[in-house]
Amino acid sequence: MVIYTSKFKNSLLDGLGVGHLSYDDQPILCNEVHPTLTLDTFISGGSSGSRPRPRWVYLDISTTNEGISEEFSSNTESKSPLLKVCGVSSKSSEGDGSSFIWFDKYRSVISRLEHSGFVEVERTVLKLRKISKELRSINKQLSRLFLDDRERAKLLSRKRKYLDFARALIGSISKSLTLYADRFFVEVPQDYAKLIQKLGFSSDTLLLHLFVNSGVLEVFLDDNSSHKFRIAYISKVHAGKYHPVKGISKGSQEAKRVLRDLLVLSELLEGSLVSYRSGGVETIHHLIPVRHFVLTAPKELSFSIWASLKKGDSSLFRAFKDAGAKAIKEFLSYLASKEHISGNLLFGFTINVHVTGDKNPFEPHFHIDAIVTFICYDKSSTKWFRLNPLLSESDLKKLRDIWKNVLLSYFGELLSEDTKSKDFDVWAGDNYYSLPLDVPQVFFELKYASRKLFVNFVNYFEQSNFDESSVSDWDFVRFVFEYSNRTERYGFLTNIKRYLSMSCSHLVEKRVQELEEFISRIEFDLSVNGNKMSDSLKRALLERLEYLKDELSELKERGFEYLFERALEKAEELLSNDNLTLERVIHILETLFTALGKSIVNYNFYVELEDVSFREFVDYLYDNHLSDVLVFSDRHRSITIIRLIPPPDGGVPV
């Protein structure tokens, strides 16, 4: 049996001395009622009604899509049947209804479960950020000193709705097997396959093979209780070139590389980030803030860049990317000057140029997707500074002004007077993240920025039908499918080891002092109390002493190189697929427990099934006579929870 435990440091999931807890196997909600109310419904006061067609278009980012081959032959054989999405035949540009038989049955987790006899009975939308934000707002208002009885009763009524909903949903999860998956595993629109066919791509490009891990997740709460949940998730996947999972995997791989370096920075800069914004007094910070920005080109400019690319000229494209980097640097310099930080400053951020959007991926919509760290390095003083990530309305106006001025300086001659007279779009999100606390969230944002952009067509077909007569430029559509969406690093992110080595020599001295102090304490304890200790405790202290002495010797010999390698190894361990997936599941559960006034402080995951084919997983569901299955379809900002039940006769798994 494999056991995974929480590994992210400094977070609520660290484990705060919670051990030897007795747990209650009974769910919080002991009745047999499942939640039937969506958050949208109970917040607005409406009725749940029948299942609606999705009204949103937002890229969701998978946490488990490693091991994807660049091409996957349709002749690949496996000893066990696997989930297979064949799409439509590329031999005929027209095709017929029968071409979609395999696609309909095997294109997704939901279709496979339904084909195996499970019946969908309910959907619940869980908007994570909205819940957290609303609860914080309610609690803040309830803490006001002067609050009349009517206002208090109204706030408590709103809070009670969240509490009742959370209890019901936690109870449902406690009694079910929950399958967590990115939404591109869960459901893929049929019209996306029609587009693949129209473009003349082989059906092999929609191949999908899935493997599953399943086990028991035990979470420990801050009230000294614990709860168990049966959790499954996608552990491995092989996808064809144009399956949306493949598009997301590109983002996953790049996100891990960038996030690994950010975690190394957070590890080695802990306690070394300086700020002057508190009345001019120097303060020290431990966390690295990160924000997501989008800088959009005017429509007129987007079409000009595409026209240039279509002719084989990439000069406008390169200039647009340079303009984005310049605008971000100017804005960060402005923020630094506000906090009286000066010098030879170097900032750190990534940029992706997106050539189209989610709303209409069939036409050019060029924009800069930037993931920005709110720290900077002064090459003159070799100090690291933290910038305030809370942006005012005047800050956002400054960013819009900077973006417009930079674009006009680069492309003014190409733009009409009407375009020049308008504001240029800028998006800065509604929150920021802190590393190393918010690793899963930052991973999602990086993955979103680095994805293959043909994924946008999947988003589009969630709410729109394929109508080839409305497509005016098929060359652009093909360009989107082949576009690499390269992630560019800027500033200190181009070589973090170089800049850390220039500024962190004191870290070696600090760590040497810590190790020498630890060694001294253990040696003193052994000399004074060694005869009174149990054999097991004494043996443990001796082993720890030997380990610390080895580390001290290595540190004195190799210095900063040793510290950097240790931080790198730690970061890579944290970014394993299993850790990222489990931390995401914990984040979802944490949102529910927060509504109950509780918090998760630690967890263990006991693996029972490891890397089994999806067919074997379905057989497992039948063999264990599980009452129902909850599918958590992760959309990043929200979770669609789909409840399926097996047929009364037990069904025939296929």
UniProtKB/Swiss-Prot annotation:
Name of this protein: Replication initiator protein
Cofactor binding notes: DNA nicking and nucleotidyltransferase are strictly dependent on Mn(2+); Mg(2+) is able to substitute in DNA nicking 5X less efficiently.
Organism name: Pyrococcus abyssi (strain GE5 / Orsay)
Maturation and modification: The N-terminus is blocked when overexpressed in E.coli.
An example molecular function term from Gene Ontology annotations: endonuclease activity
Function text: Required for rolling circle plasmid replication, has a site-specific endonuclease/ligase activity (nicking and closing). In vitro (no in vivo system yet exists) cleaves the double-stranded origin of replication (dso) site, on an ssDNA template, remaining covalently linked to the 5' end. Religates the appropriate substrates. Has nucleotidyltransferase activity, adding ATP or dATP to the 3' end of the nicked ssDNA site. Both activities require a G nucleotide at the 3' end of the nicking site.
Record keyword Plastid present: no
GO BP, sorted A to Z: DNA replication; plasmid maintenance
Cofactors, names only: Mn(2+)
Catalytic residues in the record: 448
Coiled-coil region list: 535-585
Further comment found in the protein's record: Plasmids from hyperthermophilic archaea are relaxed to positively supercoiled at physiological temperatures.
Similarity comment: Belongs to the Gram-positive plasmids replication protein type 1 family.
Catalytic activity: DNA(n) + a 2'-deoxyribonucleoside 5'-triphosphate = DNA(n+1) + diphosphate; ATP + (deoxyribonucleotide)n-3'-hydroxyl + 5'-phospho-(deoxyribonucleotide)m = (deoxyribonucleotide)n+m + AMP + diphosphate
Temperature curve summary: Optimum temperature is 105 degrees Celsius for ssDNA nicking, 75 degrees Celsius for nucleotidyltransferase activity on a ssDNA substrate. Optimum temperature for ssDNA closing is substrate dependent, being 55 and 75 degrees Celsius for the 2 substrates tested. Topoisomerase activity is only seen between 55 and 75 degrees Celsius.
Encoding gene, per UniProt annotation: rep75
Domain of life according to the entry: Archaea
Regulation: ATP and dATP inhibit nicking and closing while stimulating nucleotidyltransferase.
Keywords: ATP-binding, Coiled coil, DNA replication, DNA-binding, Endonuclease, Hydrolase, Isomerase, Ligase, Nuclease, Nucleotide-binding, Plasmid, Plasmid copy control, Topoisomerase, Transferase
EC numbers for this chain: 2.7.7.31, 3.1.21.-, 6.5.1.1
